[in-house]
């Protein structure tokens, strides 16, 4: 009721049916609409790395992709949003590090001057502690990882997501600014490709670009002759990309040395930069950069 609106008489009040929703005289309070506001952070490009299923080497791709960006002098952040199974700190040899808290701001762990990392693993008392959270708590944590971590000015934030298309993917897509799209990781097998196509469809439904598809474990590098052997088949990732008319970013062979490097906490592209696997990762990174730069160009 405004100051110019006369108050209702007792006779009018006595006619109230008790149904405010259908009453023309009831004051309507507008309900909030739309998605939650974007977190205000100084990040030029947010890149999501996800897969339809687990065990395809998604985190390995994310670590080496972020490292490749940092090696090129790009200010890069790596955000581990696999809240229930964080593995990024182990793969970078920083699992014993703990982020400092200064002036109500969390400092990410610096791997190199160009690579900053934040993970749920840093906040757990030990590696065997489970995270038993539902959706709202995970969304709150993701918001904190974006808004309360002192990322500084970043060229790229690479986000390693859990397998599938659950709360974490929805939350980061809603909260993060400048999401340039998603890199979908799969292996050549039909089962993995089937789930990868679901991830592609999900990203498109979120109205986000699919930067492209990476086929990981595409053949295997022989530890003796270093030739790439067709062990698990090839071409599944390329077929998935063609089916949905999205870019194919390249294939990365399975390399036992790459597995050992991850267990030792060293990104493989730094440990053995001349190997076929490291060169394949560099090719994928160059294709990701090209896709983002093309998307960022102003239209004629």
What are these regions (language model features)?
Residues 124-172:
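Phosphate-binding/switch loop-helix module in NTP-utilizing enzymes
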Residues 76, 81-128, 139:
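Phosphate-binding loop that captures ATP/GTP phosphates
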Residues 118, 142, 161, 174, ...:
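Glycine-rich phosphate-binding loops of nucleotide-dependent enzymes
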Residues 45-83, 200:
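Walker A/P-loop phosphate-binding motif and the immediately C-terminal alpha-helix
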Residues 38-44:
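Phosphate-binding P-loop
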Residues 2-37:
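Cysteine-cluster motifs in flexible loop/terminal segments that predominantly coordinate metals
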Residues 264-275:
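C-terminal boundary of histidine-terminating zinc-finger modules
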Residues 155-261:
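Conserved catalytic-core segment of NTP-binding enzymes
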């Amino acid at each position: 009721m405004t100051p110019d609106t006369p108050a209702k008489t007792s006779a009018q009040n006595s006619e109230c049916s008790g149904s405010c929703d259908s009453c023309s005289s009831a004051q309507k309070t507008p309900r909030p609409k739309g998605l939650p506001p974007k977190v205000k952070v100084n990040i030029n490009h947010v890149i999501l790395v996800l897969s339809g299923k687990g065990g395809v080497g998604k985190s390995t791709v994310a670590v080496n992709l972020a490292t490749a960006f940092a090696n090129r002098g790009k200010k890069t952040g790596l955000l581990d949003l696999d809240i229930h199974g964080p593995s990024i700190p182990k793969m970078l040899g920083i699992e014993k590090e703990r982020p400092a808290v200064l002036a109500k701001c969390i400092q990410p762990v610096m791997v190199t001057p160009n690579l900053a990392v934040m993970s749920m693993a840093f906040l757990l008392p030990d590696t065997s502690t489970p995270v038993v959270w539902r959706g709202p708590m995970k969304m709150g944590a993701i918001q904190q990882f974006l808004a309360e971590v002192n990322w500084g000015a970043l060229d790229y934030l690479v986000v390693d997501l859990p397998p599938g298309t659950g709360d974490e993917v929805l939350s980061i897509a809603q909260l993060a600014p400048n999401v340039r799209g998603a890199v979908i990781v799969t292996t050549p097998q039909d089962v993995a490709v089937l789930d990868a196509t679901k991830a592609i469809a999900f990203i498109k439904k979120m109205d986000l670009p699919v930067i492209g598809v990476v086929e990981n474990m595409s053949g295997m590098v022989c530890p003796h002759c270093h030739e790439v052997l067709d062990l698990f088949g090839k071409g599944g990732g390329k077929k998935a990309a063609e089916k949905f008319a999205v870019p194919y970013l390249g294939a990365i062979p399975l390399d036992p040395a790459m597995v050992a490097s991850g267990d030792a906490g060293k990104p493989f592209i730094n440990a053995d930069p001349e190997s076929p696997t490291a060169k394949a990762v560099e090719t994928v990174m160059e294709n990701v950069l090209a896709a983002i730069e093309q998307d960022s160009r102003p239209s004629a």
